[in-house]
Amino acid sequence: MENFVDENGFASLNQNIFTRDQEHMKEEDFPFEVVDQSKPTSFLQDFHHLDHDHQFDHHHHHGSSSSHPLLSVQTTSSCINNAPFEHCSYQENMVDFYETKPNLMNHHHFQAVENSYFTRNHHHHQEINLVDEHDDPMDLEQNNMMMMRMIPFDYPPTETFKPMNFVMPDEISCVSADNDCYRATSFNKTKPFLTRKLSSSSSSSSWKETKKSTLVKGQWTAEEDRVLIQLVEKYGLRKWSHIAQVLPGRIGKQCRERWHNHLRPDIKKETWSEEEDRVLIEFHKEIGNKWAEIAKRLPGRTENSIKNHWNATKRRQFSKRKCRSKYPRPSLLQDYIKSLNMGALMASSVPARGRRRESNNKKKDVVVAVEEKKKEEEVYGQDRIVPECVFTDDFGFNEKLLEEGCSIDSLLDDIPQPDIDAFVHGL
């Protein structure tokens, strides 16, 4: 009986606290209605703004389901399941997901406070009974009271709830074992680079082909020489690329070489003199086959003319024909080239002689080694590991030391003996 009275008192105390909390919440414009104590229903039963087009169908959807213990609604979804990469198909009656309040307390009856507004269509409304008929009214009231105490009063109203964007593009969300969306969306990063490289190479190759097609590699005509002389007089010796634009099929390098080697007014075209050959020999001894440098020191002779004169003289040096009247005797340049050739032959023959000497020295070393080996075999023998030594009489044992009447004891008598008595007494 005492326990019954205590329980009634505890129930009245909880009812008074619950009433004060409801009044305070009403003053703070809490969005939920105050629960009437006479009606054994949940305080969430008046949420009648649910769109009937977004009701959860327990039989149509296939997938994982979770029951809400407080709202008594069985929620199912075909998109969210245990398989993280399961194909997520689009359906017309698919509901949006909204932010939820985290778990308020470790109680098995309420897990989250969910927003009951689904922003799809607000044309038709249908009231859903959120109370299970089998639930105890007292348990529901206690749960409501405990949850209302846990919810902060500054909790944002229903209108400020923002939907969470769970919608992902089909290329990302549709990833499964039978779907190749990931393979389709993953592109090769090097593909643009390869494209640019191929395009640049193709463009460069096409440019080279057009350049080669327009380039003329034949001999210069008299008309081209005349035009080139006029252009050089007009533009000078610097603007070869500009001059080449006037001459179709020619480039600046061709124009410059044609001018300096053939069309220059101060070029000497007569036969080389002995004095010029002497100067050429001196500079060749100094700097070698640098024809451009030699041309700077030989006025009137171009790089091309100096090289041609050198090669022609070398060919005459090895020619078996008789000397013509034009060249009655070998020139100074021919003698110089001949001396160079002889020096080259001598230099090439020196290594051969050196190799012969080395081979002869090796042969001598082999002969000496064979002779030394023969001597060792004669001294030590062929089958003996230890060499056979021959001793002379000087190293023999003197047998006269042990004649008759002599013994080893007689030999030891001559050895002085220490004073044992003095050693014992410490003297």
Swiss-Prot record:
Transcription factor that binds to the motif 5'-GTAACNT-3' in the promoter of target genes (e.g. DD11 and DD18) and promotes their expression within synergid cells (e.g. in the filiform apparatus) in ovules. Required for the formation of the filiform apparatus during synergid cell differentiation in the female gametophyte. Involved in pollen tube guidance to the micropyle. The keyword DNA-binding applies. This is Transcription factor MYB98. GO terms for molecular function: DNA-binding transcription factor activity; sequence-specific DNA binding; transcription cis-regulatory region binding. PROSITE patterns: HTH_MYB. SMART domains: SANT. Residues 212-267, 268-318 form the HTH myb-type domain. It comes from Arabidopsis thaliana (Mouse-ear cress). One of its GO terms (cellular component) is nucleus. The keyword Transcription applies. Disruption phenotype: Impaired in pollen tube attraction associated with a reduced cytoplasmic calcium burst during pollen tube tips growing. Altered expression of several ovule-specific genes.
